Amino acid sequence: MAVQRTFSIIKPDAVAKNVIGKITTRFEEAGLKIVASKMKQLSKAEAEGFYAEHSERGFFGDLVAFMTSGPVVVQVLEGENAIAKNRELMGATNPKEAAAGTIRADFAESIDANAVHGSDSEAAAAREIAYFFAATEVTTR
């Protein structure tokens, strides 16, 4: 297994519920290290740019509105098979379909307000990390 980096967002719904620490603990207990982290309020332009691949989809406006509705925590996670491990921890996109004990099953309300985002590939992880973090902001541990 290779050590990878992946990108994570703790979304506005989870930040509002004050479960940042609980979610972060899940990452760490699964062997993922947080090598960069910051809380920020996304601007409309930042959210539109980040989710540009969905710009033609019907839900795009609602997605941008949700992601700018409150602060988020953006993080870089590092560890063995980090991308797959993070996706397993998150659970299915729709929390009603997420396995018990996953982040979305435990902390998300709906497919729209689903607590977390995680990269789905190495290419996506590299792009998403670079979108929010300068190389000098990502540490090694």
Swiss-Prot record:
Segment forming the signal sequence: none
Catalytic machinery residues: 117 (pros-phosphohistidine intermediate)
GO biological process: CTP biosynthetic process; GTP biosynthetic process; UTP biosynthetic process
Summary of the function given for this chain in its UniProt record: Major role in the synthesis of nucleoside triphosphates other than ATP. The ATP gamma phosphate is transferred to the NDP beta phosphate via a ping-pong mechanism, using a phosphorylated active-site intermediate.
Organism: Pseudomonas putida (strain ATCC 47054 / DSM 6125 / CFBP 8728 / NCIMB 11950 / KT2440)
Catalytically driven reaction(s): a 2'-deoxyribonucleoside 5'-diphosphate + ATP = a 2'-deoxyribonucleoside 5'-triphosphate + ADP; a ribonucleoside 5'-diphosphate + ATP = a ribonucleoside 5'-triphosphate + ADP
Family of this protein: Belongs to the NDK family.
Name this protein carries in UniProt: Nucleoside diphosphate kinase
Pfam family, one: NDK
Cofactor: Mg(2+)
Keyword 4Fe-4S: no
Binding residue positions for ATP: 11, 59, 87, 93, 104, 114
Presence of keyword tRNA processing: no
Cross-referenced NCBIfam families: PRK00668.1 (NF001908)
GO (cellular component) term, any one: cytoplasm
Lineage: Bacteria, Pseudomonadati, Pseudomonadota, Gammaproteobacteria, Pseudomonadales
Disulfide bonds: none
Main localization, broad class: cytoplasm
Self-association and partners: Homotetramer.
Alphabetized InterPro entries for the sequence: NDK-like_dom (IPR034907), NDK-like_dom_sf (IPR036850), Nucleoside_diP_kinase (IPR001564), Nucleoside_diP_kinase_AS (IPR023005)
Compartmental location: Cytoplasm
Top-level enzyme category: transferase
Keywords for this protein: ATP-binding, Cytoplasm, Kinase, Magnesium, Metal-binding, Nucleotide metabolism, Nucleotide-binding, Phosphoprotein, Transferase
A GO MF term: nucleoside diphosphate kinase activity
EC number(s) per entry: 2.7.4.6
